[in-house]
């Protein structure tokens, strides 16, 4: 195969690869899923840090939020078994207002499932839970 024929084949693929962008819905949904996966893994501080706060919060208040996340997961574990899976079903985005709703399906160890809506806010290019 000649050199020009290879470039004729590779150039369109490079063009598609470089222009293919992830949708805002995918990004917001993936962020929400990641935050809830952190909660499921017991990474409570990371989960709490996933909430949008325009101002900093006192350390003792942050600790209370972490304790609340621990209590929430402990209660769910008692009632349904551990949080076994987090799946993104869909997300909607309002690009003008920089907000989104991510729809997550939570699966528990007792095989029960619950769909939740996670409201999101975009700040400086990152998605946070509201």
Question: Where are the predicted features?
Answer:
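C-terminal motif of bacterial Sec signal peptides marking the signal peptidase cleavage site
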Residues: 14-17
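Short, aromatic-enriched amphipathic alpha-helices that serve as compact interaction elements
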Residues: 24-43
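Short beta-strand edge/turn micro-motifs at domain boundaries
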Residues: 113-130
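Bacterial N-terminal signal peptides that target proteins for export
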Residues: 1-7
């Amino acid at each position: 195969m000649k050199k020009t024929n290879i470039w004729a084949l590779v150039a369109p693929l490079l063009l598609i690869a470089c222009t293919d962008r992830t949708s805002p819905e995918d990004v917001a949904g993936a962020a929400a899923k990641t935050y809830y996966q952190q909660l499921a893994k017991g990474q409570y501080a990371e989960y709490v840090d996933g909430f949008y706060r325009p101002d900093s919060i006192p350390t003792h208040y942050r600790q209370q939020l972490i304790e609340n996340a621990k209590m929430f997961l402990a209660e769910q574990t008692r009632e349904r078994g551990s949080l076994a899976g987090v799946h993104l079903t869909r997300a909607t985005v309002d690009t003008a207002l920089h907000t989104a709703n991510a729809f997550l399906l939570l699966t528990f160890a007792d095989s029960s499932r619950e769909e939740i809506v996670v409201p999101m806010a975009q700040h400086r290019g990152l998605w946070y839970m509201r």
